[in-house]
Amino acid sequence: MEQDLREAVLRESLPQDAEQLKGLWCDVFGDPPELVDAFLSLLAGMGCGCVAEHDGRILGAAYLIHGFTLLQPGKAPLRCGYLYAVAVRPEARGRGLGAAVSHWAAELCRFHGAELICTLPAEESLYRWYGEILSLTHTSTRKVFSRDALPAGVQPLEASEYLRRREALLCGIPHVLPNEAVMDFEAALCRISGGGLYALDDMIFFAYPDKGRWVIPELLPLSAAGRIPGLNTEVLPYLCADRPLPEGLVWNLTFD
C-alpha cells in the first residue's frame, strides 16, 4: 500500500538523526559505514543536512557543504555551497521528495550565507534535473587522472599540511578554498578507500585505488600532469602549459 507523503516534514537534520541518516546513506549509495561515520562526525564543521521525515522516519536527505570559499584575485571572497549526497528511500521515490530536499537544502545553504551553490551529479542524466529544480547551469570542466601505481617516492600528508601547500600552489589562481573540516573528510574518503593525500617533490595530489588503478582527482601544481609518467588520459592543454587558466575557470574540489 502506497504511503501518503503529503505530510512529510522538511527540516534541518539533528544529532539524534545520525543512525537513520547512516542507514539511508548505506542503503542508497552502498558506501562503507566507516565513511558515513566520518562524514557525519565532521558535518557540523562542514555544513548541515536537510531531511524529509514522515511519521518519525527519514525518507530522504541532502547535505549542504558551506565550508568552501571562492577566492579570485582582485575580488571579494564568496561563500560557496556544495549540494551533496541527495538520497531517497526506494519506496518513497517518484513523489518529489528528492526535488523537495534538494530545493530546501539549497535555500538552507543560502540562509547560512552561501552566495554561490554548485553540485556534482552522480549521473549525466541528472544535470538537467538539477538545472530545473535549482536553476543551476552546467559549467564544469573535469579531468580525473589515473595510473597503474603511485610513483616512487611519494610521502603521505596530513590534511592541514595538504591544505597549506594547496593554497601556496593556487595563489593568484581563481579557486575554491575548503575549510579544515572539509579537507579532513576528503582525507578520510581517500584513506577509507585505500588511498590518501600525498606529496612528491613539489607536487601534491590525493588518490585512491579503484578497479585496479589509482584515481587522482586533484594534482598540483597545474604543470604537474606532464611530469608524472603513466597517466592514462589526454590532459587538457592548459594543465601542462605554463600559462594562466582560461578566463572564467575556477579550480574546484569535490568529493568523488
Identify the meaning behind each predicted range.
Residues 51, 57-67, 80-87, 118, ...:
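Conserved beta-strand in the GNAT
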Residues 131-153, 211-256:
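Active-site/acyl-donor-binding loops of N-acyltransferases
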Residues 102, 109-122, 232-241:
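Conserved GNAT acetyl-CoA-binding A-motif
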Residues 1-16, 148-159:
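Conserved N-terminal entry element of GNAT/NAT acetyltransferase domains
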Residues 136-217:
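Amide-forming acyltransferase catalytic core, primarily the GNAT-like/NAT-type
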Residues 105, 114-143:
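Long, hydrophobic, well-ordered secondary-structure blocks that form the structural core
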Residues 85-88, 94-109, 222-232:
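Conserved acetyl-CoA-binding loop-helix of GNAT-fold acetyltransferases
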